[in-house]
Structure formats: structure tokens, C-alpha cells
């Protein structure tokens, strides 16, 4: 049956065809069949299928199956969740235990090494409690505040990569330590081993000490066998056995009293009633330190006696102040290369009767000791009196006669001497010497006499003295401590003025000196006045510093001093040939008539030139100074003791401090000793010195808390470091241009030849730079780098460089702007403080931080001697440094960095007069 029905004739009737739906898109769409329904009519179907091999369609099938880039999974991946408070099970370990660490490794080195595995939260390096060295154990905890899982992962990575790694020559042992128990257990074991070793060393040291002690005792016993009988201690006195150490410390001869017996050095039974210093026997070996060594060591202090026994040496004192001064000065000093430690002992029942003088010890001594002490006192007084008489009667006049030759007497002096001798007949005045036995020997003092004839020289001198007295009255406005000190000085000067014989032309009065002064007067020489000071004055001048002793001028006298070549009328009156007058009225009657005759004769005598030199007081120019020496005294315990001189000052001090609350200090002596010892240990002042505030020299930084130690660690700015560090002092730039015509380099000779030939006129500026650059490569400038006063290192010229010469090329890596930004961040992260980046244009930068030449050491200056230029050489841009002016040998090379202005300022340390203060 024909499938095509179009060939049928139209006359035949239409028949219904049988059909079957082969494909219905509504039931399922197939891309190769489309979206139309496919029918089969009258059972006609498609042609039969032909079987074909699909492998034949692929021409490269024989080569094999192509490999895919994605690997096959051997197993399914497990999902990891971050550990939090809702997680089950224990927390993963976030800390590691590191052992077998070198003792030379510090905690900062370990932190820097383990920081590469993760953020380190805590690092505990175990130390030896006895020596402070490292035990080689460390516990490191990673930061788990942000994420516990990240910290645990960092700990695992640290164990994997750091375990077995050699660090400072030793392989590290790194394990996970969840709760730190491994570290604690290892630390206990190491500590037990250290303690065991320490105990062994202590026992060994004690054994050696016992052996040394036994050998020393044997040596002492052997030495004691050779001591003669007269040096052996007496049986009835408080002595020790023959094996004691006191015999070896005594030498047989004393410098003053001859032989030294054991009874003189035995410690008395009532030693606790003495003020003494004890030197323990441990510090003075008997074979090295002797009795004379101790006596020589304490020779500068007024001790009473030195005793000794098996406990050591006892040095007794009569004065608490002398004992305390000796303790402060000689404690922890050396005697025969042995360091001694003094123990201070005071009388328990000692009371203060005076503000400055300690109470006198009243004890009953045995007859032998009392006799020996009295004998020593008498001998000491006789020696002092003999020395004083020799000085005053023999040495003093001889020295004065040798130093002061007799001047030629003037006409006035001759007339006065002749008239006075003819009108008065008085016998010689015997010299009267009155002195106390207890005085210390001292040389006499020489003072100039006051001449009454100079008191009325001119009206100008009177006006000047009135102004001086008026200025003295203005001193009442000074501080209280200065007024107290001035009052004491005034009383001292008045006491000294009482010792001189003052003869005034107005009332002709004679003031007698105090007891203890020796006055020697001669008629043929200038009149000297010898004044022997007392014990109190000697002590006063000894305790006061030389710079603080000032003498106030006698306010009643207009002229204080006269020279030795002037009139000697007063000396004639007080000559040794004069008799002692009966009363003051007799002196006045006898002196009035010769004075009238002298005035009549002098009116006829020729006029002699009178010396107008006046030595009255001090010279004042303008206003008085504001600061006084007492203003610099630190008002602590030493300062108050320095200002308070006598009982009157002490009463003023009590009145000034009466409103202050009282403090419970128990023993005042021990309290004062603690304060002074603390001050001495801190190194503020030495014992015996006054507490004067030191003047700051050079750089000085004031601390708000009072001490730099109490302010902790803080960063000192670079500008402040440049004020006191020697290599950071601000350099002084000499801005004066040094014009020199010297031609020292080969380049200058070449330029001169070109200039003479007219070559320079035809060269363009760029070509001239190129020629100079080629010459620079042929002959480089002599430069070197070294410590700079501007900033760390700098570049210096080793030869003279003329203006406009090429100095050096700035060489480095040429990078882009983006790379430069990343490198700058990396440099900061790595701890490189300085980066050497030089910009050529907007996107090209030269980096000389790690690769370059010494041109990177050129520092910035606001008044530079060089400039930087960018030139083209063979199509490439290069940075070249030119000399902006003549540069001398040894001068540092600088140029202006020209940083853009920013909010974060960088201080400039160039030190130039035109310095802007900041680089940006």
C-alpha cells in the first residue's frame, strides 16, 4: 500500500488511515525529535537500525582515557567545627612545652621564633632562683581569645615544625601541654637538681672553711710560742688563754708611752659604759693586722683608747659626735687589704644636756686605769703647751721678721716717736701668756692693725661707709636661716674684734683682749698681732667648709686695714718700753699734750703724699644679688645641722618648728643614723660634707615624681637625645660659602681646556651633564661613611669638592609605586627602622634599602651643601648628587629631602641656623 496519498485520484473516496503515535512531546520532550507529534500510519515503521561501534567515532580513543585535573576522592572529607562553649569534650591544647633550650637564649628570641606559627599570648621561661639563669624550660601559650581552634592549630603546627629544630646550637624538644602539667613537673625536677647541687657546693665550701680555720689556728699557735714573757698577759687581769688571737695583734713598742703591756690593751669589765666602735675578729686576721695598724688607721680621730681581746678591737671615745663621725668615715674601709666592718655602741643611759655637746660619761675607773689615763692626759697637755709656746715665742716672731722687712719711717712717725718718748717715761710691759691646758696646738694668726688716722680721710669715704651700713640693714628681708647664720657670724666677728687693741682718735680708748690671746708689740717694726684661737673656734672652723666662712666687718670702724709702711704712732704708745698705766684717765691725760705738739710740728713739716688706698669692706655694684649661699642648702638633717651653729640658732629653730606635729621616732640618734646612712648608700653626698644642692651642668631633665627610677620606662624623643649623646649632638652648619680658586681634580682641568677651546658654548646642558657623568664614572670622588651628628650614619668628603661637581650617583633597585608601598610595610614589620626610597617620578622609585651604594647615607639638612638631580643617560633616568657649594675636606654631605607636608611631623636634627624644625 502506497504511503503517499497524494497520487491518488481525486475521484476515489478518502479512506481513514490507521495510525499510531510514536512520539508525544507532552509525555516527554526529546531534543533530537523536537516538539511535534510523530505518527505511524498503516503499520509502516522506520528502517531497521544499523549496529555501529561508537569507539570508531573517536579517532584518539586508542591513546587512552584523558586524565581529569580533579583528583578522585579516596574518602569523604570530615567537617570541622570551631570549638565554643557549646562543644562537647575537652578543649584542644593551645600551649606547648619547649625543653632543651640553650641558657643563652632569651625570652624575646623565643617569642620572635614561635610568633611565625601563631599569635603568642604568654611565654614563661623558667629561671634558676639562685643565679637567675635560664633552666632551658619554657611554656608557650597561643592566643585563644579570638578563636580556640586557631590557637590549637598553631600549637600543632609549632610541634610539627619546631620539634627537633636546632636553635642556638641545641635541638629543641616541643610537645603539646594541655594544662601545663608537663612544664611544672620538669621545673620541679630541675629545681631539685639545682638545690642538690647548691647543697653539695655549700657543704664543700664549709669543709674548706673549716680546713682553713684549723690551719690558721695552728699558725697562730705557732706564732704565739715565740712571744716573749713581757708581752704575755697578766694572770690577775681579764686575759684569755695562750691560744687566743690577741697576742699576735700587739707590737712591742708604742710611739708615745714606750713599751706596751698587756694590761694597757685588756678590755675593762665595764666596757658597756663606754662609747666604742667594735672591729670583729673575723675581719682582722692576726697574722696580717696588728695593734699599730689599727692605731694608725684611726689616727685622724680623737679616740680615747684602743683595747683588744678575742672578740676584736674596741676603740673607745669620750664624745658621741666624734664616734659617729669616725663610724661614718671608716666603716667598710680597708686595713692591710682587709675590709673591716665597725659596730657602733652607745651608752644606754646617755642623756643630752646640750644641743650640740654630748653628756660626759661618769664612771669609776680602777686605780691603775685612772692613773694611766691621768698620765696620758697630762703628757698630752704638756706636749700641746710646749708646742704652743715654741710656735708663739720662737717660730712666730722668726717667720714674721723674715717675711716683713722694716720699712723706712716717715717724717710723721719719727716726730711722733721722738715727742712721745721724751714726754712719757714708762717702764717695759712684760708679756703675759695665759693659756689653758686643754687647748690643741695651732699656729698663731696674723692680722693687720686698725689705724685711727685713716678714719677721717675724706667725706667720700664716710658717705661710702654709710651706704654700706645702709645696705647691711636691708639684709633683714632675707630668709630666716640666712639671718640666723648672719647673726652668728656677727657675734663671731665681734668676739674676734675684742681680741685686738683698738686706738681711736676720738676717745683714745683701749679695749683689752680675752684670756688666752698673746700680743707681741715691737717699736722698730710694723706691729703684728698674734691671736691664738681656742678649742671651740678650731672645731668650728674645722667643721665649716672654707667657702662658707665669712667675716663681717666691724661696723664702728670706717677704715679696717692699714699697710705696714704707714704711721706707727699707736705702736710707739704700746711699745714694750711703756709702763702699765694706773687707769684710763691717766692714759688720756698723757696722750692729749703730745698730740697737740705733733699737730703743730706737722703744720711746718713738708707735705708728704698720703696713700689714698682704702680697703674698707666689700665693693657693691648695683643691686644686691638675689641668691645667697644659704639658699642652696638642702633643708634635710645635714642641712639643718649645717645652719644651726649655736644655742641661739637652736632656739630660733625650735620657735620656727613649734607648730609642726611631733613624730614618734624612739631613739633620735638611731633615727638620725638611719637617715644619714640611707643618704650615704644612695650616693647623694659623702660623710662630713654639707648637703649643698648640686648645680645642673649641661643637659638636665626634671622629674615630676622626684626620681627617674620611680617613673619607669619611657621613650625619649630623638630631639632630646641629641642634647646629651656625643654622636647625636646637633651639628653646626657653616653657611658661609668658601670661595676657592684651587683646581684639584682632573675634571676641572678638562673643563678648563674645553672652556678655552670654546667647546662648552656649543654643548647643551643635558650633554654637559652627560659628559660630567661619564667623567664621574672614570674618577670617583673620595667619600666615606661614619657616625653622624645629625642621624646615625652619614657620608663625609675625603677631599675638597668644588661647586657644581658631580659627587655620587644614588644607586638602588628600580621598582613601581605599588611595590614600594608593600616593601615599606614589610620593612616596618621586619623591624627595619630606616627605608631608603628615592622617587624619580610618580610611578618609578629607587629602593636602596637592601641593594645600593653609600649614597643612601647622605642625611637631610635645611641648609644643604648638595642637591639631587635626575638626568638621562642612554635613555635611562639616573639620580646624581651635585655639590651646591664648595665642600671642604671632612665635611658631611647633606641635601634637602623635600618631603611633602604631613600631619605626623618628623623632627629635624640638622642644627642649621635656618632649620625648619621638621622634615615634613
Curated annotation (Swiss-Prot):
What domain of life is recorded for the organism? Eukaryota
Q: Locations of Basic and acidic residues compositional bias?
A: 205-216
Q: Does the keyword RNA-binding apply?
A: yes
Reaction(s) catalysed (UniProt annotation): L-lysyl(4)-[histone H3] + 3 S-adenosyl-L-methionine = N(6),N(6),N(6)-trimethyl-L-lysyl(4)-[histone H3] + 3 S-adenosyl-L-homocysteine + 3 H(+); N(6)-methyl-L-lysyl(4)-[histone H3] + S-adenosyl-L-methionine = N(6),N(6)-dimethyl-L-lysyl(4)-[histone H3] + S-adenosyl-L-homocysteine + H(+); N(6),N(6)-dimethyl-L-lysyl(4)-[histone H3] + S-adenosyl-L-methionine = N(6),N(6),N(6)-trimethyl-L-lysyl(4)-[histone H3] + S-adenosyl-L-homocysteine + H(+)
Kindly report, in one word, the top-level EC class recorded for this enzyme: transferase
Q: How does it assemble?
A: Component of the Set1C/COMPASS complex composed of ash2, sdc1, set1, shg1, spp1, swd1, swd2 and swd3.
Q: Which family does it belong to?
A: Belongs to the class V-like SAM-binding methyltransferase superfamily.
Please give the name of this protein. Histone-lysine N-methyltransferase, H3 lysine-4 specific
Amino acid at each position: 500500500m502506497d504511503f503517499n496519498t497524494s497520487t491518488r485520484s481525486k475521484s476515489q473516496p478518502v479512506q481513514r488511515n490507521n495510525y499510531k503515535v510514536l512520539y508525544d512531546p507532552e509525555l516527554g520532550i526529546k531534543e533530537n525529535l523536537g516538539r511535534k507529534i510523530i505518527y505511524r500510519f498503516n503499520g509502516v515503521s522506520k528502517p531497521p537500525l544499523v549496529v555501529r561501534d561508537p569507539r570508531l567515532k573517536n579517532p584518539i580513543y586508542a591513546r587512552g582515557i584523558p586524565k581529569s585535573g580533579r583528583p578522585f576522592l579516596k574518602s569523604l572529607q570530615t567537617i570541622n567545627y570551631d570549638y565554643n562553649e557549646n562543644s562537647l569534650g575537652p578543649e584542644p591544647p593551645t600551649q606547648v612545652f619547649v625543653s632543651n633550650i640553650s641558657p643563652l637564649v632569651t625570652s624575646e628570641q623565643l617569642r620572635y621564633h614561635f610568633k611565625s606559627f601563631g599569635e603568642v599570648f604568654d611565654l614563661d621561661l623558667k629561671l634558676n632562683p639562685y643565679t637567675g639563669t635560664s633552666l632551658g624550660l619554657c611554656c608557650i601559650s597561643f592566643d585563644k581569645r579570638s578563636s580556640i581552634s586557631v590557637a590549637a592549630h598553631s600549637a600543632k603546627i609549632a610541634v610539627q615544625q619546631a620539634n627537633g629544630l636546632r636553635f642556638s646550637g641545641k635541638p629543641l624538644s616541643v610537645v603539646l601541654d594541655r594544662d601545663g602539667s608537663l612544664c611544672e613537673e620538669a621545673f620541679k625536677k630541675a629545681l631539685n637538681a639545682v638545690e642538690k647541687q647548691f647543697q653539695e657546693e655549700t657543704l664543700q665550701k664549709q669543709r674548706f672553711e673549716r680546713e682553713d680555720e684549723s690551719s690558721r689556728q695552728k699558725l697562730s699557735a705557732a706564732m704565739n710560742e715565740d712571744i716573749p714573757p713581757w708581752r704575755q698577759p697578766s694572770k690577775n687581769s681579764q686575759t684569755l688563754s695562750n691560744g687566743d688571737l690577741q697576742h699576735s695583734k700587739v707590737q712591742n713598742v708604742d710611739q708615745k708611752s714606750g713599751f706596751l703591756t698587756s694590761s694597757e690593751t685588756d678590755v675593762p669589765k665595764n666596757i658597756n659604759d663606754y662609747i666604742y666602735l667594735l672591729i670583729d675578729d673575723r675581719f682582722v686576721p692576726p697574722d696580717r693586722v696588728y695593734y699599730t695598724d689599727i692605731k694608725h688607721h684611726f689616727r685622724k680621730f680623737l679616740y680615747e683608747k684602743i683595747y683588744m681581746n678575742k672578740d676584736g678591737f674596741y676603740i673607745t671615745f669620750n664624745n658621741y659626735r666624734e664616734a659617729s663621725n669616725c663610724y661614718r668615715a671608716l666603716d667598710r674601709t680597708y686595713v692591710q687589704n682587709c675590709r673591716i666592718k665597725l659596730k657602733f655602741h652607745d651608752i644606754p643611759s646617755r642623756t643630752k644636756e646640750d644641743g650640740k655637746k654630748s653628756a660626759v660619761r661618769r664612771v669609776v675607773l680602777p686605780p691603775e686605769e685612772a692613773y694611766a689615763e691621768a698620765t696620758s692626759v697630762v703628757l698630752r697637755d704638756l706636749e700641746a703647751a710646749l708646742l704652743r709656746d715654741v710656735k708663739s715665742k720662737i717660730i712666730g716672731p722668726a717667720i714674721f721678721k723674715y717675711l716683713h722687712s722694716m720699712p723706712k719711717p716717715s717724717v710723721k712717725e719719727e716726730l711722733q716717736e721722738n715727742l712721745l718718748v721724751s714726754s712719757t717715761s714708762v717702764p717695759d710691759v712684760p708679756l703675759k701668756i695665759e693659756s689653758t691646758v686643754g687647748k690643741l696646738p695651732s699656729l698663731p694668726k696674723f692680722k693687720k692693725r686698725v689705724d685711727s688716722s685713716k678714719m677721717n680721710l675724706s667725706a667720700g669715704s664716710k658717705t661710702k661707709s654709710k651706704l654700706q651700713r645702709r645696705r647691711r640693714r636691708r639684709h633683714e628681708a632675707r630668709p630666716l636661716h640666712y639671718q640666723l647664720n648672719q647673726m652668728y657670724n656677727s657675734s663671731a666677728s665681734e668676739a674676734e674684734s675684742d681680741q685686738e687693741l683698738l686706738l681711736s682718735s676720738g676717745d683714745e680708748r683701749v679695749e683689752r683682749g680675752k684670756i688666752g690671746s698673746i700680743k707681741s708689740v715691737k717699736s722698730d717694726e710694723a706691729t703684728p698681732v698674734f691671736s691664738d684661737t681656742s678649742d671651740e673656734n678650731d672645731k668650728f672652723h674645722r667643721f665649716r667648709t672654707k667657702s662658707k666662712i665669712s667675716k663681717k666687718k666691724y661696723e664702728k670702724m670706717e677704715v679696717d686695714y692699714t699697710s705696714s709702711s704707714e704711721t706707727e704712732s699707736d705702736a710707739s704708745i704700746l711699745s714694750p718700753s711703756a709702763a702699765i698705766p694706773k687707769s684710763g684717765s691717766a692714759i688720756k691725760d698723757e696722750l692729749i699734750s703730745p698730740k697737740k705738739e705733733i699737730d703743730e710740728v706737722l703744720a711746718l713739716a713738708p707735705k708728704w703724699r698720703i696713700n689714698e688706698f682704702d680697703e674698707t669692706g666689700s665693693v657693691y655694684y648695683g643691686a644686691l644679688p638675689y641668691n645667697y649661699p644659704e639658699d642652696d642648702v638642702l633643708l634635710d638633717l645635714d642641712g639643718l645641722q649645717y645652719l644651726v651653729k649655736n644655742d641661739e640658732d637652736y632656739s630660733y629653730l625650735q620657735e620656727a618648728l613649734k607648730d609642726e606635729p611631733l613624730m614618734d621616732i624612739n631613739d633620735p640618734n638611731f633615727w638620725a643614723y638611719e637617715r644619714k646612712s640611707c643618704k650615704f648608700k644612695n650616693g647623694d653626698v659623702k660623710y662630713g660634707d654639707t648637703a649643698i644642692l648640686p648645680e645642673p651642668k649641661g643637659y638636665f631633665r626634671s622629674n615630676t615624681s622626684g626620681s627617674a627610677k620611680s617613673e619607669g620606662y619611657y621613650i625619649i624623643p630623638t630631639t632630646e637625645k641629641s642634647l646629651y649623646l656625643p654622636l647625636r649632638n646637633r651639628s653646626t652648619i657653616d653657611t658661609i660659602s668658601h670661595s676657592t680658586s684651587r683646581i684639584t681634580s682632573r675634571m676641572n682641568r678638562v673643563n678648563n681646556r674645553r672652556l678655552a677651546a670654546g667647546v662648552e658654548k656649543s654643548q647643551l646642558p643635558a650633554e654637559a651633564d652627560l659628559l660630567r657623568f661619564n667623567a664621574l664614572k672614570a674618577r670617583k670622588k673620595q667619600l666615606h661613611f661614619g657616625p653622624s651628628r645629625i642621624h646615625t650614619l652619614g657620608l663625609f668628603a675625603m677631599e675638597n669638592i668644588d661647586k657644581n661637581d658631580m659627587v655620587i650617583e644614588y644607586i638602588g633597585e628600580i621598582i613601581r609605586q605599588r611595590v614600594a608601598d608593600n616593601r615599606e610595610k614589610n620593612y616596618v614589620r621586619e623591624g627595619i627602622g630606616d627605608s631608603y626610597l628615592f622617587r624619580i617620578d610618580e610611578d618609578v622609585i629607587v629602593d636602596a634599602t637592601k641593594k645600593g651604594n653609600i649614597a643612601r647615607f647622605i642625611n637631610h639638612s635645611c641648609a644643604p651643601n648638595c642637591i639631587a638631580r635626575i638626568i638621562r643617560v642612554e635613555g635611562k633616568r639616573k639620580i646624581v648628587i651635585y655639590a651646591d657649594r664648595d665642600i671642604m675636606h671632612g665635611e658631611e654631605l647633606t641635601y634637602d629631602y623635600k618631603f611633602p607636608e604631613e600631619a605626623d611631623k618628623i623632627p629635624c636634627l640638622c642644627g642649621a641656623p635656618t632649620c625648619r624644625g621638621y622634615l615634613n
